[in-house]
């Protein structure tokens, strides 16, 4: 087994003895597993395998994502942080110089994040409603990237509203869109076109990528604030 750097800073490729490749992040808190993921050691460093079936962002990278604005030192607002599966990999990437502000609506789900953030001090858990971005203004500064994984019909509007308050000029948004959460009666492609049109009223749409086969009827959009 060996590990090499991915073209995205902070992401790695683990090459198993059988030649198969997986993506991973260097564990910011060695010894800590977050969601039962496989952990490997190579040349004195510990890497956490990024499971694409458990993480939309992981699926996007494996599917050939071209634009990945989350980098070492980035400040990220994560909407729909849940119990921290993807956020833990984002935490690994941004490192101690970066910060992940994780907004979650459900108190029960956010409680699951508490043990994680006790050691990962670069994740700030926030109980809040992503549809009301003013509600966490006292806690969140201007950020480099907003990542949204909120399965709601208004998810494009949620990203726009949060970007108006928190995203730096020239900053990036990433949004995982589940077509069935927006309109179950329409074909996914039609929904994605409508979302892209709505996003383009405020952002420059940089990229759109299907998350099949890892996530059915999902697409990831990367957008840039002018």
UniProtKB/Swiss-Prot annotation:
Q: Which UniProt keywords apply?
A: Methyltransferase, RNA-binding, rRNA processing, Transferase, tRNA processing
What is the E.C. number? 2.1.1.-
Q: Where does S-adenosyl-L-methionine bind?
A: 85-86, 104-105, 129-130, 149-152
Q: Transmembrane residues, as ranges? A: none
Record Gene3D superfamilies = Phosphorylase Kinase, domain 1, Vaccinia Virus protein VP39
Q: Name one GO biological process term.
A: rRNA methylation
Is Endoplasmic reticulum a UniProt keyword of this protein? no
**What's the short name of a Pfam family annotated to this entry?**
Fibrillarin
Q: Which InterPro entries match?
A: Fibrillarin, Fibrillarin_CS, SAM-dependent_MTases_sf
Top-level enzyme category: transferase
Example GO molecular function: rRNA methyltransferase activity
Looking up PANTHER family in the UniProt record yields: FIBRILLARIN (PTHR10335:SF17), RRNA 2-O-METHYLTRANSFERASE FIBRILLARIN (PTHR10335)
Q: Which family does it belong to?
A: Belongs to the methyltransferase superfamily. Fibrillarin family.
What does this chain do? Involved in pre-rRNA and tRNA processing. Utilizes the methyl donor S-adenosyl-L-methionine to catalyze the site-specific 2'-hydroxyl methylation of ribose moieties in rRNA and tRNA. Site specificity is provided by a guide RNA that base pairs with the substrate. Methylation occurs at a characteristic distance from the sequence involved in base pairing with the guide RNA.
Q: How does it assemble?
A: Interacts with nop5. Component of box C/D small ribonucleoprotein (sRNP) particles that contain rpl7ae, FlpA and nop5, plus a guide RNA.
Q: Which protein, by its recorded name, is this?
A: Fibrillarin-like rRNA/tRNA 2'-O-methyltransferase
- Source organism: Thermococcus kodakarensis (strain ATCC BAA-918 / JCM 12380 / KOD1)
- Record lineage: Archaea, Methanobacteriati, Methanobacteriota, Thermococci, Thermococcales
């Amino acid at each position: 087994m060996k590990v090499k750097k991915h073209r995205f800073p902070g992401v790695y490729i683990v090459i198993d003895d059988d030649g198969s490749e997986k993506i991973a992040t260097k564990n910011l808190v060695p010894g800590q597993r977050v969601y039962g993921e496989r952990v490997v050691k190579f040349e004195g460093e510990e890497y956490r395998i990024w499971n694409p079936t458990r993480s939309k962002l992981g699926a996007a990278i494996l599917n050939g994502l071209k634009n990945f604005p989350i980098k070492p030192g980035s400040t990220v607002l994560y909407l729909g942080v849940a119990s921290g599966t993807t956020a833990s990999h984002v935490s690994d990437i941004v490192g101690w110089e970066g910060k992940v502000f994780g907004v979650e609506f459900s108190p029960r789900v956010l409680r699951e994040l508490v043990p994680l953030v006790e050691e990962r001090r670069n994740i700030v858990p926030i109980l809040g409603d992503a549809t009301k971005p003013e509600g966490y203004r006292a806690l969140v500064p201007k950020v480099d990237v907003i990542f949204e994984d909120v399965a709601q019909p208004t998810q494009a509007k949620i990203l726009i509203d949060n970007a108006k308050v928190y995203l730096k000029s020239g900053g990036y948004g990433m949004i995982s869109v589940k077509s069935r959460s927006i309109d179950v009666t329409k074909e996914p492609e039609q929904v994605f076109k409508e979302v892209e049109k709505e996003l383009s009223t405020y952002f420059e749409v940089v990229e759109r990528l299907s998350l099949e086969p890892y996530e059915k009827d999902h697409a990831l959009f990367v957008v840039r604030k002018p």
